[in-house]
């Protein structure tokens, strides 16, 4: 007796006809449709939301009306809860947004009633308003301190050539010196001058008239680089040297650095005749820990 354990490779009839089993094999569909097949066979329906929406923002729970989330059409929240996009839910059925929810309550309060955060939270809420693209909230916050003052400060710094580059240079020089010396802090010299030609006759006011008698060819005699690590200036604005020093300390402190500075004199380099450079030199002390 012969036991057949398999089927002949070619089970089709010689006349080209197929058996019923052959037909079933040829039209057998996979148990799980592929993404392409599913997209054609089962188009996704718009997601529907309840009138009262439970939210999970990075683990922080909130509850609000659907109309509140949609109150400004051109925002990320309005788009997310328009039904055109799928939003996952957590185990409790709350709609989940993978974002830190610390300041989302301030965002909701603005959407609900136009309330604005206190000054100490303005910067943090501004970042959330940027993320959720809430234009009206951004406009309101930009007119509050400290952002309003920051706009004025940046307008001044916009007149300062290479301000950001020089700021980074201060940090890099201080870091390298601290590493090389195995020291807790590093010192460097910074020249800050406002005027285009911060040069005066040395200890002789009567020679001030010579300042205006120089020819254009003499200008090259007055051009030089002070022996410092970084120089800032000149600029044309009401803000003076002390305002720029305040900006430097503010921006360096924002990087977590401890900054001290003091004026240690002027360049005092002899240029020509009775003229010496009177650009002020400041010593910056950057403490790393």
From Swiss-Prot:
Protein's organism: Homo sapiens (Human)
Keyword entries, A-Z: Cell membrane, Cytoplasm, Disease variant, Epilepsy, Membrane, Neurodegeneration, Neuronal ceroid lipofuscinosis
Gene Ontology cellular-component terms listed: cytoplasm; cytosol; plasma membrane
Alphabetical list of SUPFAM superfamilies matching this protein: POZ domain (SSF54695)
Keyword Nuclease in annotation: no
Record has Glycosyltransferase as a keyword: no
Function: May be involved in the control of excitability of cortical neurons.
BTB domain sequence ranges: 51-149
Quaternary assembly: Interacts with CUL3.
The protein, known as: BTB/POZ domain-containing protein KCTD7
Subcellular location: Cell membrane; Cytoplasm, Cytosol
Disorder named in the UniProt entry: Epilepsy, progressive myoclonic 3, with or without intracellular inclusions: A form of progressive myoclonic epilepsy, a clinically and genetically heterogeneous group of disorders defined by the combination of action and reflex myoclonus, other types of epileptic seizures, and progressive neurodegeneration and neurocognitive impairment. EPM3 is an autosomal recessive, severe, form with early onset. Multifocal myoclonic seizures begin between 16 and 24 months of age after normal initial development. Neurodegeneration and regression occur with seizure onset. Defects in KCTD7 are a cause of opsoclonus-myoclonus ataxia-like syndrome. Opsoclonus myoclonus ataxia syndrome (OMS) is a rare pervasive and frequently permanent disorder that usually develops in previously healthy children with normal premorbid psychomotor development and characterized by association of abnormal eye movements (opsoclonus), severe dyskinesia (myoclonus), cerebellar ataxia, functional regression, and behavioral problems. The syndrome is considered to be an immune-mediated disorder and may be tumor-associated or idiopathic.
BP GO annotations: intracellular glutamate homeostasis; intracellular potassium ion homeostasis; membrane hyperpolarization; protein homooligomerization
Record-linked Pfam families: BTB_2
Entries under InterPro entries matching the protein: BTB/POZ_dom, SKP1/BTB/POZ_sf, T1-type_BTB
Sample GO molecular function, one term: identical protein binding
Region feature (Disordered): 1-35
